[in-house]
Amino acid sequence: MRSIINILLVIPFFSFSQENIKYSNTININDLYDHIEILSSDSLEGRETGKPGQKMAAHYIANHFKNIGIPAFKRNTYFQKFKVKSQRHVCKCDDCDLTFFKRIFKSNQTIRGENVLGYIEGTDLKDELIIITAHYDHLGKHDSLIFNGADDDASGVAGAMEIAEAFMIAKKEGYGPRRSILIMPVSGEEKGLLGSEYYTDNPIYPLENTIANLNIDMIGRLDDWHDNGNYVYLIGSDRLSLELHNLNEEINAKYIGLDLDYRFNDEEDPNRYYYLSLIHI
């Protein structure tokens, strides 16, 4: 988990130096687990978008941004609120192959959610923006069964929160990123990628100035294709150009040493992960 977060932290600098190593080392594994434990606790009832647990999670993330020194982006708020129509579904997870089967039981439901925005201004290239996203909503609960969503995607949100803190430590010591960074945990993902779609249609910062979106999902997942946890699936890094793909390869080969797995970076993959990743772009 730590190595995966390190590569995500370094890419926005588009370089790797002793300062970058120093600030990546400020990421604390215990803090990561603390964030995951809180976000996936029963008290948040699975963080279904529009429900009280999702609102509690949003405020928890916003308070973290405030505590590490990220200012509210406008009108003294960290939230981009949205209201959309969506279908609601229950997913059953097959433990053998992690296939999700959806049963639709209500449509035309009004969903009210929030994206949480933490903006860190850059230096000489501050008009260019890199967005780091992770969805903080999950499936909620069904009767007495709570879908806690520790890995999907409290783990990714915890990573994004720690990346934000590392950037702020670097910035306060005069080593902030050249490009501006938007750390944006989104909601509505389990309802149909609603939060990320809403931001794309209603961007706070011009899309033409956004040069990359790095999305984090399930950074604690282990599977049968790898004999250890030192790997990451990369999807969509070569969609618009090879620049991000080549940067991933270069930084990883020199400094990180992860197994970069591209098996799902395929338009023909039946899981359609490649297609879903493009919606975030």
Language-model-detected regions and their locations in the chain:
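A non-catalytic alpha/beta surface segment that caps or lines the substrate-entry region
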Residues: 47-119
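Second-shell loop/turn segments in exported
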Residues: 20-25, 43-52, 103-106, 144-153, ...
